[in-house]
Structures are given as C-alpha cells and as structure tokens.
Amino acid sequence: MGLVLGLKKQFQKFLVRTFFEGAKKTKATRDFANATNQNFEELAMYDRDMLRARARWLSANNPIMSNIDSTIINNVVGRGISLQSVDDTLQEAWNTWQKSCDLTGRRTLNDMQRLMLQTRMVDGECFIYKKYTKNGFKIQLLEADQLDTYAGKSGLDIDKDGKVTAYYFKTDGDTVKIDAKHIINYHKSNRISQYRGVSEYSRSIIDIKNFQGFTSANIQSLRARANIAYAVEGDDVNPFDYNATDQDGDKIQEINDAFVFYLNAGEKIHTLDSNATPVNYQEFVQSTVRMIATGRNISYELAFRDFSQVNFSSARASILQDNKRFDSEQEHMITYILEDLYKTWYEYEVLNGREAVELPVVSWVVPVREWVRPKEDLSVVLEMVDRNLSTYTDAAKSRGKVFEEILVQRQAEEALIKKYGLNTEEIQNAITKA
C-alpha cells in the first residue's frame, strides 16, 4: 500500500512539473538548455567581457547600432544637461568648474555626459572616480576593463547587508582599492541581485550580426553577377580547348565592356540574371531593424529614420513613446550622477571645510525637445497651464529654460525698451522685418 501511495505522489509531482507549457522539455525548447536560476552576478561574470567586446565591435562597425546610440544621446543629453540656480555666484562657480572638471584635462562635463551614456549603453557600465586634488575637485571616467575582477567579488567588496564598500582597479600593473564613496558605478539594473552592468546590445547582438551577414552575402552575389554578364556554352567540347573567337579570329574576352566567363568552349551566348535579389529583402530588412529597435527600447522610425511607412498620428505616437524613454534616461543620469557630483562639488569647492549648511536647491535643464507642430503644441501647453494641469515652470523646463530666469530677462528687456522710448509692437515689427 505504501509503495502505491509513493508512486502516486511521484506521478502527481510529475503532473505538476509539466502543468505549465513553458516549463516542458521538448525539441522546441532545446534552446533553453542554458536557462538556469542563479544569482545574476554568477551568471553574468562569464559572459560580461565577451558581450562588451562584441558590442564595441558593432558600435564601431554597424551604422544601425551607431545611429541608435547617437539618436538616444542627442535626445537625452544633447549639448549637456545643465545646472540652473537663482544664485548667480553659485551658477558662475559651477559653470567654471564644469569646464575643467576632467582630471585628464581633455573634456568638459557636457562632453563627459555624452561619453558616460555612450559607454553605459555599449559596455553596460561606466565608472566615475571622484578625486580631490591640489587643483580642486576633479572627476575621471574609468572603463570596465580597468576593474580588477579577480579581486573581491568581480572587483567589488560587498558587506553583509549587500552594500558595495569598495572597488578594485588596475593601474600600472598594480591593483588599487578605492572606497565606494569615491566611485559612481553608472549602470542600469534589471535584477535585484545585480551589482554591475551588462551591455545593452546583449539582446540584439545575434540579430544585428545575422542581418550584416545576410546583407553582405546578397551584395557579394550581386557584385559577382554584375562582373560576369555573359557566358559561352558548348556541348561535348574539351573544356580546356577555348576556341570561341570573334570575326578577327581572336578569343572572345569581353562583350560590351563586360568580362566573359567560359564554361566550355562553344558558340552559344546568353546573359546571366544580374537582378537575382530575394523579393522579400526589403521586408527582411524592416522586420530585422524592428526587432533590433525593440531590443534597444526605441521605435523603428527613430532607429532607421524611416517615417514613410506610417501616417502622422502613428509617427507622433511613436515619438511620444520614445520621449518617455528619453525622460527616464535623463532622470536616471540626474539622480545617480549629476546630483551626486553637485553635492560633492558644493561640499568641497564651496564650503571648503566650513560648517555645512543646507544644500542649495537647483534645477537641471535638459535639452530642448522640439515640437512637431509648434502652434498646436503651444496651444496645448497654455491650455494645460490655464486648467491647472501644468505650470509655467514645467513649460519653461520643457524648453530648456528656467521660469524665473525668463521673468528676470523679460523685466530687463522691458526696461531696455522703455529706455529707448519704444513699445513691444514696434520691437516685434522690427524683428519680423529683419
């Protein structure tokens, strides 16, 4: 009786294991052979370097991936996410610092913002070293290759609470341990157990490589057919006896400036099909690029700069979704990098050892997002403000401005107009005529 109950329980467990279709082991699911439930870092440590190397190759050699990166960077960072403060002294001090904040003296903070985002997308992560020097507070960008992954846990020290306490970096053959408070590890996490980044190309590497291979094969095929325009054929003839000649008795070498390829010596001539291109090539390109764009979380239209397949409403809907991604990226960079740098800079450069005071509130101005239909979009913004669904501050920020600065500038302009005895209408007419 016990044996029967035992077999029954085993059978019930088997039924439970196979209840979900997605968990069944069949020929169709053989590609899931490497699917396993492990700590993220245990899984990623073996593939991270290879993914990074392949992503760098694609970034340098593939125009589609390069265009996607450039599109994201131009929309997220543009000419730089800038600090705005009503305190002129603070504003001027920050502007001066951000022009010379690079420890290596090669880049401004705006340049570094673009490079940080580019590196994070391709490599998966970027390290920012906050260093205090005799020349003031500086920052240095470090690549993932410089992390000594053989020290600590993949280059990190993690305490019992799961907090990173130190990083290990390679320098001149030695390994240097740097306290975590001096390092910003700029990456995006997809799992709770993740501490380091993985290339954002990881979902698209195979698709883009297959696309390149398919395109290259078709181009080579067409080039070969274009170079061999005619063929001479013959039956039951010695293939080494090339005796096909023209009217002067010379062997035929080319026809209409195209080389002739001899299959066998003979007299029958026909043209090869130089237009043998797969009829579904365009569909293949579009579907592949859509898949790549989806893997990069961006619309096909923006990734391929192709709006010919959609109407205005569909294009606008795609742009709105892309803008949400850009908004998220901007918030991520401001929260994890710029606010951290601002706080550290203020404590070191402004306070300079003096008693700490409350950190002055500042605004971060993102690149101007151009309107698709300026008049209609402006009307919508003004109506939202009138209906208390938005504010002038938010409206100004969306145009890369600070509302208070606009008011100050407007006040100065009004005073200038009054000084010269003019009115607003005359100024507008003068600008229109100019």
Language-model-detected regions and their locations in the chain:
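Activation/maturation switch segments at domain boundaries
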Residues: 2-5, 267-278, 282, 315-326, ...
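Structured, mid-chain assembly/scaffold modules that mediate subunit interfaces
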Residues: 60-195, 384
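C-terminal amphipathic alpha-helical
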Residues: 106-130, 277-375, 379, 424-427
